[in-house]
């Protein structure tokens, strides 16, 4: 984690022109949980924060709901202003209240998110979007990938451990998925994975981090959710999948419909203490395999242990 300097400096915009760059002004995230994302600066004022009403929403617990504001000056330069955030806005290692930005300048919000002012044309914007998607999303299901989850989990785990708030991790695995692949083929198996992903996504909150963890295993990170409510969430997902029909095409090209079940394991920071993030993941994985050994199509957590 980046150490936050204590001193604060202030610099007021002095009318320096934005320069001769063409294209749209954008903020590119070059460090932090949203790394790789690009946000177009198309309004006179743009709020950066983790609140739902922020213009640039960065879902990082170390960032305030309304953390900083970018303003366009009369000569089309950009000024970033801190909005009395808890963890501060930094420029070149110093905490700032207000600073003028030039093309290529970087500033930091919170403990680890670094943003860079740049100018992009439409082709560059699309390239940046595709680059971010390919780096963070699973190509088959459209869910976040394992690397993205681990990056987010590292930040969330540290925050929850410091502030004594709940964080739950649900691990799901499709029961007997190999039999689906063996009987119907891998194309059918992929169709099942994609449909199941959509079901889980629709049954989850906007702020929940859902990822394909590997193969037929999925993980959901639930911020500020205790063990009891995480177990209720996992049971709701399990029942919804058990009651659903999954459409697929068999090896001969004929349409088919099947049912399936999942098993789930839950670990919660707050209900138990974990020395490391790896211990936290291992606990959820342990409960997942307890559910498997107990007969599958069930959820296991620390409740009742």
What feature does the model see in each segment?
Residues 35-111:
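Forkhead-associated
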Residues 197-198, 229-250, 283-285:
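Alpha-helical scaffold within the catalytic cores of cyclic-nucleotide enzymes
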Residues 141, 170-173, 215, 284:
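Conserved metal-coordinating catalytic motifs of nucleotidyl cyclase and c-di-GMP turnover enzymes
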